[in-house]
């Protein structure tokens, strides 16, 4: 077996003007840097959506990806967001730290806006994704909708899944 080496760098630690590293241009630059340095591996931390405490080792789902890592500049290039919309939020003033509170407050509304502007092709891809991931996605979506509606502290064990779905439909 040939010896090789690599680097551990969380995606969140990549440079970004939007508060957190993404799978955008900086990720590609980092991969090119690794290749030029003779490194063969980029080890990353888990990519799930983080919960209270923002630890990648305590995600809401082991299947879902963290929406924070979606490249906003790619959404601008696709015409789903404007440069002004992406520049408007306060992403924090310390490039050495991720302010998860600011990220949560600003990024998710931008992603929702981008999806609302999506054309039929992207919507068809989202529908296909939902169908392909039907084993876990409906329950994850239900949980996240309940969390958004009622906050982080919920007594979900008091209700059946069907009762919870009815609560969301009424909200």
What are these regions (language model features)?
Residues 2-149:
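Acidic/aromatic-lined carbohydrate-recognition and catalytic surfaces
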Residues 148-171:
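Conserved AAA+ ATPase core "coupling" helix
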């Amino acid at each position: 077996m040939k010896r090789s080496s690599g680097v551990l760098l969380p995606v969140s630690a990549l440079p970004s003007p939007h508060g957190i590293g993404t799978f955008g241009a900086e990720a590609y630059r980092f991969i090119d840097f690794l290749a030029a340095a003779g490194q063969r591996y980029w080890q990353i931390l888990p990519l799930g959506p983080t919960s209270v405490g923002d630890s990648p080792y305590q995600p809401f789902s082991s299947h879902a990806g963290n929406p924070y890592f979606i490249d906003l500049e790619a959404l601008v290039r696709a015409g789903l967001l404007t440069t002004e919309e992406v520049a408007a939020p306060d992403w924090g003033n310390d490039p050495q730290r991720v302010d998860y509170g600011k990220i949560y407050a600003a990024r998710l509304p931008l992603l929702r806006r981008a999806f609302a502007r999506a054309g039929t092709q992207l919507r068809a891809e989202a529908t296909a994704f939902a169908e392909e991931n039907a084993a876990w996605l409906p329950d994850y979506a239900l949980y996240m909708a309940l969390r958004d509606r009622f906050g982080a502290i919920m007594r979900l064990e008091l209700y059946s899944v069907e009762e919870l779905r009815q609560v969301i439909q009424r909200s």
